[in-house]
Structures are given as structure tokens and as C-alpha cells.
Curated annotation (Swiss-Prot):
It comes from Synechocystis sp. (strain ATCC 27184 / PCC 6803 / Kazusa). The active site is at 275 (proton donor/acceptor). It is found in: Cytoplasm. Catalyzes the oxidation of L-aspartate to iminoaspartate, the first step in the de novo biosynthesis of NAD(+). Pathway: Cofactor biosynthesis; NAD(+) biosynthesis; iminoaspartate from L-aspartate (oxidase route): step 1/1. Belongs to the FAD-dependent oxidoreductase 2 family. NadB subfamily. Binds 1 FAD per subunit. This is L-aspartate oxidase. GO terms for cellular component: cytoplasm. Pfam families: FAD_binding_2 (PF00890), Succ_DH_flav_C (PF02910). Its EC number is 1.4.3.16.
């Protein structure tokens, strides 16, 4: 097998991608491709936990029912059943790998989270994602069959034209574009929160896997369903940090810039209304009262809570806010809603197989059907582990004989990176603002149509960039050696902007198509949930259609 030939190429180094590497058969040669340094994915940021029905008083059936209730009629019952019944084994495997979950004595500690009927959420202090990713990374680095390519950017999938099979991926790495030929490609690139002006996702969450798959003809679905958290610490230059709903549960007030407690203007329960209601209240209040609502905040005032109780209940929030210059005992926390989790993704079955043979997807990149229209808390890390476990049984066809003599010729190209920088940076600044205002927490047909028209204009301009004309249609049988000022930074900016423009178009199209409100999708002009829309929104190429839901509720 040649240097650029692999059995499986895994794209993404969060919990999903790392665990996939560990679950793939040990005799497979695996390439792990990650566009940044390791441990910059969203699962490393996950403060929440991982859910499993392991308590004597709990059951997979109860976990199943809670998941379906949260999913607002769009969960796939078979996928949810698979998830909850494999959850205890997933926890056992993580413990065996060395993840140190919190314990009460000899027993794993379980906490109760929103919309769960039983305490079933395991934590590793308040940084569960980091604990899992750190442990898995150590295991992957020790695997002799896994070759890690850091700061490598996936550009396009290699689809065999006669069979339609995915046979590899084109990658920019070490200032060279080359094709990694493989028997399968697994996309585990996380979500796309950077398409919105406010997000809890890290900078690398630009929807890469979903964009790559869609451009290659894979089916994607339910992309209108995005979960927004109502209260994230929001300061210029500071990464968004979630302020738990428990803070409002203890009595904290939401105030606007004038000091008005405004939440009761939108719902009789005020700050204690459901998460999506509070998010909409803040979003609408900022739209009504601020000149630039995409950059504005409201304030979470903890003064009604006794200081001793704050210290006992929220030590991590105290520490993190203080680190970013906010003393919560002396001042309110500036907060705003933020895009948090993308329920939709590349359509897959329970074996991670997409609609393209040889192409697999996992984690937030995939749409397995377990989340429906609204994810149940702490099911996302679980989904990564449970579905990755299926890859132990992965059987692949031989590498195509045409791939045995590849990348022999090298072509050198100098890229003038300065020409296109202004437009690329303009889109990276303006696209998240446009999406936040038109496809964020509150949507309506008129503004969605306006945004789609703007996106179509930007897409046409993107295709006319000198860099796009040069890079978008490179031959797969050549290595391309690139040079130019600031090349690595430019290539990441170019590729991510391409992906963000595409996923923005997909979100807008799906949101306009669904003429109702359900789960993580709210239409001001269609505020009711309608039985006839209890179906998945599917996009395949330019075709948009409904697919009946397999929900068992």
C-alpha cells in the first residue's frame, strides 16, 4: 500500500473521529485528518455530560421515551432504541479506556438534567468532553495503524464516476494538494455553529463534512433544526461560555441595558420559561431595543441569590467569568443566545453509512435520527461513542486497482493569495450576521428569501475568485505543490468560507421549505406545529423533499 493509500480516511479529531479510529479493525491502515491542532473540536468544549440508563431505578425504555419526547416527532425510533440500549456498554468501554467519571464512593455519579425523567447523566467534573477527548487522543496516538495529519484541510471527496463509490479525499497538507486514496471515508467534522454570529462552537466548526458530502451528491436532512442556548457569556474577543439554566432556576434575573427585567413581557414564567422560549424572548427584545442586535447582550443578574449559595452551586461559572473579567458577585453577566448544536446532518443508517457507498458520517456531522427536531441533553457525546462502536464490524471492498499508481506527477502552482482576501474576509464577517438575523432563533419567509438571494449573489462571486477557478477543479492524479504568501492561513480561509456559504444556503433553503414551527426551528409567520409536517426535510443536490418520520411517539 502506497504512502497516500489507506483503508479508511477519518476526517475530524473530536470524540467521534477519535473513537472511530479506536473502533476500526486494527489491521486497517487509517489516516486521521484534522485541519487544526488536535483537541480543537466542539467535544473538547463540552461542559455537559453523557447520558446512559445505568441506575437500578432507570431503564433504556425510560431513556428512549425521554429522547422521543424531546425530539418533537422527528426521532427515528429504531435509531433511538439502538442508542439507549447500547449506552451502558458505551460507558463501560470509556471507563475501560481510562475516562475518569465522577463517583459517589464506588459508584458512578449520576445527575438529573433538563427533560430527563431520571438521574442518568455522567460527568467528569464540569469538563466531560475534554476528559473523553484527552483520553481517546492518548489511545489513538499509541495506535500503530493510525497516521495523524494535523493542519490538513479536506477539499473534496473522490467519487468514482462509474460506480458512484467514494474512493478517497483531496487534502491540502504540507503546502501540497494530494488525494488520499482509500476504501472508505468517514466524516466526523462536528457542527457548523460558525455560520452564526453568536455560537458556543469553536472556530473550526464550519460545517465542513456536511458541505463536502452535499457537494458530492450525498443526502442531507433536517438542516433547519439548530439548537440555541439562551444564556452564553458574550464579550468581545471572548469564547462563548454557557451559563447553566440552573442559575436562572436559583433565582437570577434577566435585565436589559436599561435594567428592566423584561422576560415576563414575553412569557408568564419569565426567566423560568422553556429554553427555546427564553432564547426567543432575548432575541426579540434585542431586535426591538438595540441598533446592532447581532453584537448586543442582555445581563444575567445573580444578586437575588445568596452569595454562599452561588459559591456552593456554581464554582466553575465563578472561575470562568472571573477569568474573562466578570465578577458575578459585583456585576451582572453579559449574555446572549448562541447557536449550540446542529440536529440535522448527512443522512446515515445505524452503521454510519451515508447514501454514497464508501462514505460514512458520525457525530454532529451525521443525521442518524436520534435527535429529531430537538436534542435531549447529553445524548450528543453518547451518539458519537455508540455509533462509532458499529465500525468494529466494518467490512470494505478492495482498493480499486486504478488507485495503485497514483500521485506520480507533481505540478507547481504559485497562488496569488492577496487578490481574494478582501472578499473572503468580508463574507466571513457578514455571513454570520446575515444568518443570525434571518435564520437564527426567529425566522420568517420574507427575510429567508432575502438571505437566499444574497447567498446566491455571494456564491456567484465566490466562483469568480481567481483562487476558486484554480482550486475548485484540480485533477486527482496529480500532486499540486502550492506556494504564496500566507498560504496555510489562506487555504483554510478559502475552504472554510466555501463550506460556510454552502451550509448557509442549505439551512436557509430548509428553513424556508418547512412552513411550521417545530423543535429547533421557529417561524414567526408559521408559529404552530402541524401534523402534516411530521416528516424530515431532505436535500439531495438541488432537490428538496419530505421523507416520512419513523418516530414511534
Amino acid at each position: 500500500m502506497g504512502a497516500n493509500q489507506f483503508d479508511v480516511v477519518v476526517v475530524g479529531s473530536g470524540a467521534a473521529g477519535l473513537y472511530a479510529c479506536l473502533c476500526l479493525p486494527g489491521h486497517y491502515r487509517v489516516a486521521l485528518v484534522t485541519k487544526a491542532e488536535l483537541k480543537t473540536g466542539a467535544s473538547d468544549w463540552a461542559q455537559g455530560g453523557i447520558a446512559a440508563a445505568i441506575a437500578p431505578t432507570d431503564s433504556p425504555q425510560s431513556h428512549y421515551e425521554d429522547t422521543l419526547a424531546a425530539g418533537a416527532g422527528l426521532c427515528d425510533g429504531e435509531a433511538v432504541d439502538f442508542l439507549v440500549n447500547h449506552a451502558p456498554q458505551a460507558i463501560a468501554e470509556l471507563v475501560q479506556f481510562g475516562v475518569s467519571f465522577d463517583r459517589h464512593g464506588q459508584h458512578l455519579a449520576l445527575t438529573l438534567e433538563a427533560a430527563h425523567s431520571q438521574p442518568r447523566v455522567l460527568h467528569a467534573a464540569d469538563t466531560t468532553g475534554r476528559a473523553i477527548v484527552s483520553t481517546l487522543m492518548g489511545q489513538v496516538q499509541a495506535r500503530p495503524n493510525v497516521e495523524i495529519f494535523s493542519q490538513a484541510i479536506a477539499l473534496s471527496l473522490n467519487i468514482e464516476p462509474t460506480t458512484g463509490h467514494c474512493r478517497g479525499i483531496q487534502v491540502f497538507v504540507n503546502q501540497t494538494i494530494e488525494t488520499f486514496h482509500s476504501r472508505a471515508v468517514l466524516l466526523a467534522t462536528g457542527g457548523g455553529g460558525q455560520v452564526f454570529a453568536q455560537t458556543t462552537n469553536p472556530k473550526v466548526s464550519t460545517g465542513d463534512g456536511i458541505a463536502l458530502a452535499w457537494r458530492s451528491g450525498a443526502q442531507v436532512r433536517d438542516l433547519e433544526f439548530f439548537q440555541f442556548h439562551p444564556t452564553a457569556l458574550t464579550k468581545p474577543g471572548v469564547p462563548h461560555f454557557l451559563i447553566s439554566e440552573a442559575v436562572r432556576g436559583e433565582g437570577a434575573h434577566l435585565l436589559d441595558r436599561q435594567g428592566k427585567r423584561f422576560a415576563f413581557d414575553y412569557h408568564p414564567r419569565g426567566e423560568l420559561a422553556p429554553r427555546d422560549v427564553v432564547s426567543r424572548a432575548i432575541f426579540q427584545h434585542l431586535a426591538n431595543t438595540e441598533k446592532d442586535p447581532t453584537q448586543a447582550t442582555v445581563f444575567l443578574d445573580l444578586s437575588p441569590i445568596e452569595p454562599e449559595r452561588i459559591q456552593r452551586r456554581f464554582p466553575n461559572i465563578i472561575r470562568r467569568c472571573l477569568h474573562w473579567g466578570v465578577d458575578i458577585f459585583r456585576e451582572p453577566i453579559p449574555v446572549a443566545p448562541a447557536a449550540h448544536y446542529w440536529m440535522g446532518g448527512i443522512t446515515t443508517d445505524i452503521n454510519c453509512q451515508t447514501t454514497i457507498p464508501g462514505l460514512y458520517a458520525l457525530g454532529e456531522t451525521a443525521s442518524t435520527g436520534v435527535h429529531g427536531a430537538n436534542r435531549l441533553a447529553s445524548n450528543s457525546l453518547l451518539e458519537c461513542i455508540v455509533f462509532a462502536s458499529q465500525l468494529r464490524n466494518l467490512s470494505l471492498p478492495p482498493l480499486a486497482s486504478s488507485d495503485s499508481n497514483v500521485n506520480q506527477s507533481i505540478k507547481e502552482i504559485r497562488l496569488d493569495t492577496t487578490n481574494d482576501l478582501a472578499l473572503l474576509n468580508h463574507w466571513r464577517s457578514e455571513l454570520p450576521r446575515l444568518m443570525w438575523q434571518t435564520a437564527g432563533i426567529c425566522r420568517q419567509a420574507e427575510t429567508l428569501q432575502m438571505a437566499i438571494a444574497k447567498l446566491e449573489q455571494w456564491q456567484e462571486q465566490w466562483q469568480q475568485l481567481s483562487s476558486s477557478k484554480l482550486l475548485a477543479h484540480l485533477p486527482e492524479d496529480q500532486k499540486i505543490s502550492l506556494s504564496g504568501p500566507g498560504l496555510n492561513e489562506f487555504m483554510q480561509l478559502w475552504a472554510e468560507t466555501h463550506n460556510l456559504l454552502d451550509i448557509a444556503q442549505l439551512i436557509l433553503t430548509s428553513a424556508l421549505f418547512r412552513e411550521e414551527s417545530r423543535g429547533g426551528h421557529y417561524r414567526l409567520d408559521c408559529p404552530d406545529t402541524k401534523r402534516e409536517w411530521q416528516s424530515h426535510t431532505v436535500i439531495e443536490g438541488t432537490r428538496v423533499f419530505l421523507q416520512p418520520s419513523q418516530s414511534q411517539d
